Amino acid sequence: MSKEKFERSKPHVNVGTIGHVDHGKTTLTAAITTVLAKTYGGSARAFDQIDNAPEEKARGITINTSHVEYDTPSRHYAHVDCPGHADYVKNMITGAAQMDGAILVVAATDGPMPQTREHILLGRQVGVPFIIVFMNKCDMVDDEELLELVEMEVRELLSAYDFPGDDLPVVRGSALKALEGEAEWEAKIIELAGYLDSYIPEPERAIDKPFLLPIEDVFSISGRGTVVTGRVERGIVKVGEEVEIVGIKDTVKSTCTGVEMFRKLLDEGRAGENVGVLLRGIKREDIERGQVLAKPGSIKPHTKFDSEVYILSKEEGGRHTPFFKGYRPQFYFRTTDVTGTIELPEGVEMVMPGDNVNMVVTLIHPIAMDDGLRFAIREGGRTVGAGVVAKVIA
């Protein structure tokens, strides 16, 4: 088949497989691409092509991730699969592969296992909004009651972590049999794809969200005022609109009196563009890198939050020694470092390089943040960890 041109017309949705080791995540990924290619067109990806995942760097952390793409009649999917448990943890915490929804793979022969639980918890903490369950290896279980029992266990586990366990879709299938072309099991893959289409809503595009620009630099231009530069993270800013400067200091209002890109004047700056924004009545010394420019009322500054963190191993260039509760590193948000203190969970005395841990962080300056914001943990400019804001506290 010749390479089709990339269809921008279909909504684009990011998904991924999560679940315990050897429950069949990669086999399912291969089965989805194969069955959907056969049914709706597109190209299949073999198991071994998916399993030897290339390394990527996200926030200075090496992660092995496989990306595959597939289509249903109504959508285009980008799907991420990781070979190892540690890769999942890193992937979910760094947000290297943001997921609009996840397929939780549980082997019917085993039921939920420790990593099943851990991936569900991580999904909750990092804000994976929707989970669909694929009960795999159902061809190996003859007892209908056993299947009922496993499904019930999985639903209860999801409910325990605040997912709608009673209502979310559960598909009973066999990835291997589907991959081998057995029609009754291929039908289960089509059923799963149907749930991807119907259960995961179309994600809101960055351009439709409220305006936010992390400030990278500040200049004053004589006779014109103060210009801040940076890449618009989301939304649109139009000339004449009110904006807020949020973080580090008290929040200040201003008006955008001009937008420039490559020395040209524009009417607006949009998500993804590197722009300069001219601000009315603001002095150069009133603004600094690390603040954000945002739609008024859309984001607030905070100093205290609950987070999920991955600490780099020595081999990844991280610390060589554990840290304890008095640890005071820098937390790097968007464009700047802010010092913070940490509280570890009860019973956790120290954190080893290579661990992932839940911690409450208190920053010495407020930073504009929402749940789901990613950050790096640094010591003297060197990245030693990555984290995500699970919940803002104050």
UniProtKB/Swiss-Prot annotation:
It catalyses: GTP + H2O = GDP + phosphate + H(+). It is an enzyme of class 3 (hydrolase). Residues 10-204 form the tr-type G domain. Residues 174-176 are annotated as: G5. One of its GO terms (molecular function) is guanosine tetraphosphate binding. One of its GO terms (cellular component) is cytosol. Residues 19-26 are annotated as: G1. Its EC number is 3.6.5.3. It is found in: Cytoplasm. GTP binds at residues 19-26, 81-85, 136-139. Keywords: Cytoplasm, Elongation factor, GTP-binding, Hydrolase, Magnesium, Metal-binding, Nucleotide-binding, Protein biosynthesis. Residues 81-84 are annotated as: G3. The keyword GTP-binding applies. PROSITE patterns: G_TR_1, G_TR_2. Pfam families: GTP_EFTU, GTP_EFTU_D2, GTP_EFTU_D3. Its main location: cytoplasm. It comes from the Bacteria. Residues 136-139 are annotated as: G4. Belongs to the TRAFAC class translation factor GTPase superfamily. Classic translation factor GTPase family. EF-Tu/EF-1A subfamily. Monomer. GTP hydrolase that promotes the GTP-dependent binding of aminoacyl-tRNA to the A-site of ribosomes during protein biosynthesis. HAMAP family: EF_Tu_B. This is Elongation factor Tu 2. The gene is tuf2.
